[in-house]
Amino acid sequence: VRRAIWYALRNYKEDEQVSIFLQRIIENDKKYYSVSDAFRSLVIVDSSAAKKKVDSLLNRDSHTDVIRKAAISYFGIVMNDENYNKLKNLSAYGGTTWDARPEAINQLGKYANNKTETIDLFIEFLSDNTRSVRRNAVRQIGRYGEKKHLDALDELLAEDPILERNIRYAKKSILKPSNKMKNDQEKEIEELTKKLDNIRKLVN
């Protein structure tokens, strides 16, 4: 219930009282997921306040690294060259924890349209030692890649057949970009609908 409330608070952008409230949750709440959701909302409500907390959260351990992943999302929401470089460092081998690195790959994807060199990073990540990193790189190539990247996906399929489903979906998305856009939009609408339903339940 509280997590749905924290999510709803992101609608109060630039509200000082909401910002202060969310900061207190981040500082005092003992529940990892509560802190994670509060920070994600703070990034929307008050990105300046979120910036002051992001470094400490990057060093805060939690179950499945949910807090560190939330901190990494800041660099994909507040988009600038400095944050892009930060994501490149976090996504590199040893840049952050094993569980959190894949999130850095996801956030890098938000820069792919404006920074075309990002797709080259995803191609490099196909050779990473961590399967979750390779999987997320495949997904980003499916979203932003071109036909010339299909060979790299085929090579990975031969080396890591466990990722077959992800690779085939990525290749299909590249070959049929109109369907890719439609599927991404449908998924986003479904997620927003679910979150709105949760908020309505709280209100009622």
Question: What positions do the PLM features span?
Answer:
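Short amphipathic alpha-helical interaction elements located at domain edges
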Residues: 161-162, 166, 199
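Structural detector for internal amphipathic alpha-helices that build alpha-solenoid repeat scaffolds
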Residues: 1-14, 24, 33-47, 66-80, ...
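Alpha-solenoid HEAT/Armadillo-like helical repeat scaffolds in large eukaryotic proteins
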Residues: 21-29, 53-61, 86-94, 121-129, ...
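Terminal, low-structured helical/coil segments at or just beyond the last alpha-helical repeat
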Residues: 180-204
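Short, charged low-complexity linker/loop segments at the C-terminal edge of domains
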Residues: 151-152, 175-185
